[in-house]
């Protein structure tokens, strides 16, 4: 078991948060990680942050982790996608670089179900037609 003193001497893993995440999500990381932020949609800023040496990067939809970004990342071990799809991650390039890619495939199940129920209720009550009539002044 690692003592508190030994843990303080060990460098914390560096996590790059490349897009805005909720404070609760960032809070989960706590003080166990060295957290850095960048604008993942800004290509130059992303590449510079990746070149600085990070262990993990947290992304959403706007950040493109293609072969160039993966190649620029020194020491990167994990690409974590806060969301369902992985279309913005070059999986073959990450695999070749031995980088673990993870996502949250069930993160929007409740929201999707709520939206489906709301659409069914709107359809049952003819809300789209009523809205159109109201806007037309009828």
Regions found by a protein language model. Name each.
Residues 2-102:
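An N-terminal-biased, well-structured beta-alpha scaffold segment characteristic
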Residues 97, 105-138:
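Phosphate-binding beta-alpha-beta segment of Rossmann-like dinucleotide-binding domains, i.e.
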């Amino acid at each position: 078991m690692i003592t508190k003193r030994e843990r303080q001497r060990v460098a914390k893993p560096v996590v790059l948060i490349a897009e805005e995440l909720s404070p609760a999500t960032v809070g989960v990381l706590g003080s166990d990680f060295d957290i850095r932020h960048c604008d993942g949609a800004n290509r130059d800023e992303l590449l510079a942050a990746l070149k600085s040496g990070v262990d993990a990067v947290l992304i959403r939809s706007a950040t493109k982790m293609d072969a160039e970004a993966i190649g620029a990342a020194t020491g990167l071990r994990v690409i974590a996608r806060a969301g369902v799809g992985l279309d913005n991650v070059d999986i073959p390039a990450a695999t070749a670089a031995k980088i673990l890619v993870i996502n949250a495939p069930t993160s929007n199940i409740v929201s999707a179900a709520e939206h489906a129920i709301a659409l069914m209720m709107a359809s049952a009550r003819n809300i789209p037609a009523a809205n159109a009539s109201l806007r037309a002044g009828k």
